[in-house]
Amino acid sequence: MSWKVYLSGEIHTDWREQIIAGAAELKLDIEFYSANTDHESSDAAGDHLRSNDVPFWRDHQSSKVNAIRTKNLIKQCDIGVVRFGDKYRQWNAAFDAGMLAALDKPFITLHDEGIIHPLKEVDAAAMAWAETPQQIVEILRYVTNN
C-alpha cells in the first residue's frame, strides 16, 4: 500500500527534502504532497482573477485559490507532518494542523524544544512530536513497514 504524506509548514529550510530523501533511501512506499512552497507564486495565486491594490483582498483571493490545493491534499493524505520553525510564525501550519485534527488524520509535529509551550495544544492533538527530519523518516519507516 502506498502512503500519502502531506508536508505542511515552514518553507525556509530544506526539511521537506531531507524527509523525502530519507524515505527514498529506505525505499519507503510513500507519495509526498505539499502546499505551494514558492512564496511569491503562492502570494500571487489569485492575481489572474482580479487586480487588487488592497493587500487584504489580494491575500484573500490568493488564499482561497491556494486552499483548493491544500484542502484536497489534506483530505487525501494518510498522515501529515507539520513543521514549525522558530524564526517565523507559521499561521498556515497551525491551520493545517487544525484541519488534520478535525478530519481525524494522524499527524506528527516537527519543531525544536524551544517552542513546546506555544504549541502545547497542537502537540496534544498530534500522534507524535519530532525534533529532526530524520526522526520523521524513522516514524514513517515504522508505520509503513509493519
Outline where the language-model segments fall.
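Conserved catalytic or regulatory cores that recognize and/or transform ribose-phosphate-containing ligands
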Residues: 1-146
